[in-house]
Amino acid sequence: MMRPKIYLFGDSITEESFSAGGWGAALAHHFSRTADVVLRGFSGYNTRWAMKVLDKVFPAEMNVGNGRAPLAVTVFFGANDACLPDRCSAFQHVPIDEYSQNLHAIVAYLKNRWPSTHVILITPPPIDEVARLLHRYGEIHSDLPERTNEAARNYAKACVTVARECGAPVVDLWSRMHQFPDWGKAYLRDGLHLTLGGNKIVFEEVIGKLKEVGLSLETLPADLPFTDAMDPNDPLKVFDQMPTTDFKMFRVI
C-alpha cells in the first residue's frame, strides 16, 4: 500500500519537529489515516548546504516504479543563513541574495521533479536577542548574540518575496509571531528554537496553507476502512468494497 507523503525539509527547527509537542509530530498525528509525514530536518543547515544534499534527500529512485509525487514539501530554512558574518556562527551565514537564489533553486528542483507537488515555504522565526545571550553558542565571552531579530526579519522578507515570485504558499512565521507582544518568551525557548506554543503556531499555519491548496482531512481519502464503516453482522464485507468505498465519509469523530 503506497500512502501519499508530505515531506518536511529544513534545519534544526524541522529536525526537532518530531519531538514531544512538535509541529511535525502534530502533522503526523493529524494525517495519521491519510498520509505519511516524512521528516528531513538537518540541524545547523543553511540553504547553501541544503542545495548540496537535495539529490540525497529526494533521490532519483523516488520516481521509479510505483513512486508517487509527494502531496507537499515544506521548505523551512533561513535561521542559519541569517547568522551574522562577523560572529561565532559565521560559517553558517549565507548572504541574503544567495539565500533568495537558493530558495528559488530548491523550489524549482522540487517542482521540476513533481509538478503537482505543493511546495510551502516557511520563513525563519524572529530572534529574541536577550535569550540568545542567555543560551550562548560559541562566543562565551561575547556580549553580542550570533543572530539578531533585524537580520531574521530581512531573511523572512526575502523568503516571502521568493514565494511570491514562485507562486508558492508561504508561512510568514516572523510576522505571525510578532503579532503577540510576549512572542519571545511564549514561542522561543532559547531565543531561536520553538516552545510548545511556538510549535503550535507552526502546526496551525502549515495546516492552514495545506487546506488552501486542497489538502485536508475533508479532501484526502482514508487509507483503510474505519470501524464504523463495518457492518457488525458482516465486518469483512467492507474490505470487498475497498476499491469503491470512500471511507472518510464514515470516520469516527
Q: Which residue ranges define each predicted feature?
A:
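Surface-exposed, active-site-proximal loop segments in enzymatic domains
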Residues: 83-93, 130-140, 185-187
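Conserved SGNH/GDSL esterase-like catalytic core that processes O-acyl groups on lipids
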Residues: 2-115, 121, 228-253
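Substrate-gating cap/lid alpha-helix
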Residues: 129-173, 196-200
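Conserved catalytic region of serine esterases and O-acyltransferases that act on ester linkages
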Residues: 2-3, 69, 122, 161, ...
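Generic structural signal for helix capping and beta-alpha/helix-loop junctions
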Residues: 16, 47, 129, 178-180
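Alpha-helical packing segments of well-folded alpha/beta enzyme cores
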Residues: 99-106, 155, 159, 202, ...
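Short, well-ordered beta-to-alpha junction loops that form the rim of enzyme active sites
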Residues: 123-126, 173-175
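Alpha-helical structural signal in soluble globular domains
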Residues: 26-30, 109, 113, 158-166, ...
